[in-house]
Amino acid sequence: MVKMLVLYYSAYGYMEQMAKAAAEGAREGGAEVTLKRVPELVPEEVAKASHYKIDQEAPIATPGELADYDAIIIGTATRYGMMASQMKNFLDQTGGLWAKGALINKVGSVMVSTATQHGGAELALISTQWQMQHHGMIIVPLSYAYREQMGNDVVRGGAPYGMTTTADGDGSRQPSAQELDGARFQGRRVAEITAKLHG
């Protein structure tokens, strides 16, 4: 059975919802899934004052455990067109894994959230994939296999590179049913492709 990690960073809970949906989809695809998050870097008093969702259930991951999985889906908030510093800080600690080639031929995939439709989602998806490529990981994107990302009638999440959600910073827009469906699709797709590669 494929072992998958869904690893995320979420300040306000939007990516937490997407990560849970991706984990559901991966389980539907036959994977054994672990859901974890990266540590928060913002001081607790600042996080509370900014209304961060600090009561998230998922345990904190450690960089060394990434080698224990066949596939890793990263979900991160976007900051100025890049992954959040919390995720970058975590990935910057994987140099030891890189030196050993511990993630070579593992499967990787990415999802992101932004506060606006044009908040740099695609750039954040691609730049996070670069981190995985430096490790020799095999990238599995959302791709246009997920057709529900097409259309301009409503705000829709998704890009060929990975699933996205646009969630307003004030909480007035949460991930939509379509965006959560896309996250489940991506999780299932990654699980099924990983099974073909590592099964």
From Swiss-Prot:
It catalyses: a quinone + NADH + H(+) = a quinol + NAD(+); a quinone + NADPH + H(+) = a quinol + NADP(+). Substrate binds at W98. InterPro entries: Flavodoxin/NO_synth, Flavoprotein-like_sf, Flavoprotein_WrbA-like, FMN_Rdtase-like_dom, NQO. GO terms for cellular component: membrane. GO terms for molecular function: flavin adenine dinucleotide binding; FMN binding; NAD binding; NADH:ubiquinone reductase (non-electrogenic) activity; NADP binding; NADPH dehydrogenase (quinone) activity. Keywords: Flavoprotein, FMN, NAD, NADP, Nucleotide-binding, Oxidoreductase. Its EC number is 1.6.5.2. Residues 163-177 have a biased composition (Polar residues). NAD(+) binds at Y12. Residues 158-181 are annotated as: Disordered. Its cofactor is FMN. Binds 1 FMN per monomer. Belongs to the WrbA family. The keyword Transcription regulation does not apply. FMN binds at residues 10-15, 78-80, 113-119, 134. Residues 4-190 form the Flavodoxin-like domain. PANTHER family: FLAVODOXIN-RELATED PROTEIN WRBA-RELATED, FLAVOPROTEIN-LIKE PROTEIN YCP4-RELATED. The keyword Flavoprotein applies. This is NAD(P)H dehydrogenase (quinone).
